[in-house]
Amino acid sequence: MKVALLGAAGGIGQTLALLLKLRLPVGTDLALYDISPVTPGIAVDISHIPTSVSAVGYSGEDPSEALKGANLVIITAGVARKPGMTRADLFNINADIVKNLVEKVAEVCPKACIGIVTNPVNTLVPIAAEVLRKAGVYDKRKLFGVTTLDVVRAKTFTSELKEKHVETVKVPVIGGHSGPTILPLLSQALSEGLPLSFTQEEIEALTYRIQNAGTEVVEAKAGGGSATLSMAESGARFAVAVFKALLGEDCVRYAYVESKEGSGYPEFFAHPVRFGLTGVEELLPIGKLSEYEQAKLDELKPVLEADIALGKNFVNP
């Protein structure tokens, strides 16, 4: 079984490569690809770490060698956010990069699962879907946007606010992966399996912080980058869990995937997902929303739908 990481020399990619080397199951092949000539060296560097995961690096314009035989492809390639940029500002550059990479996936390993980390996820996942559709290989079970960082942040910030042990806290996060499209369901938040209670003021402040946490990091880094380390750790959590699901382990994670037709949700939406041998096996119920959450959901739908349309129109102008 093989994982290919595209964008392995970037701020997220290098850390993610390290974490995958440490956490993937014994015997996994890890292929690292980036346009940068340092990529083979990154693979040599992590190959000195004593785990039973083999790492090989590839650089240049063509990722085909890295993709051969891949079961799971994780895409982190693209430019990062800088101060003053929104995730949507990244679109013009990253849309082309992801489109070209997914075209290669469609050609070289069309049955592989694809996890997209590169932003703007809301728009790039629909681009990938259209590229795969054009190539005649689209399978909605095998394409997902990685929104794990929103879940991780919700868990961390909620545990800090409520002074609970972070490992015991669970907070669902649905919707999209930018600003107001990120919707934490604090009405369903649990600690040690018991519901947590919040004042309305706490709900509004916590929701705002989770939605704008990316900007918090960009500003704190004072022009020196965006959220790379927490994103890499979240990406590793997701990639390892999904890879183990492909090997037969039970796995439920939140991810931005194609919705069921007639569900009332936008065409792509972050749901709780049961992953299995073929990728997405089942979209699980989102559960009952509070009035506040329902209002936020109604607000985010047109924003997310516009993001999705932007992606589809990029491939089919």
UniProtKB/Swiss-Prot annotation:
It catalyses: (S)-malate + NAD(+) = oxaloacetate + NADH + H(+). One of its GO terms (molecular function) is L-malate dehydrogenase (NAD+) activity. One of its GO terms (cellular component) is cytoplasm. Pfam families: Ldh_1_C, Ldh_1_N. GO terms for biological process: carboxylic acid metabolic process; tricarboxylic acid cycle. Keywords: NAD, Oxidoreductase, Tricarboxylic acid cycle. NAD(+) binds at residues 7-13, 34, 94, 117-119, 231. InterPro entries: L-lactate/malate_DH, Lactate/malate_DH_C, Lactate/malate_DH_N, Lactate_DH/Glyco_Ohase_4_C, Malate_DH_type1, Malate_DH_type1_bac, NAD(P)-bd_dom_sf. It comes from the Bacteria. The active site is at 177 (proton acceptor). Substrate binds at residues 81, 87, 119, 153. It is an enzyme of class 1 (oxidoreductase). Its EC number is 1.1.1.37. Belongs to the LDH/MDH superfamily. MDH type 1 family. NCBIfam families: MDH_euk_gproteo. PANTHER family: MALATE AND LACTATE DEHYDROGENASE, MALATE DEHYDROGENASE, MITOCHONDRIAL. Catalyzes the reversible oxidation of malate to oxaloacetate. Homodimer. This is Malate dehydrogenase. The gene is mdh.
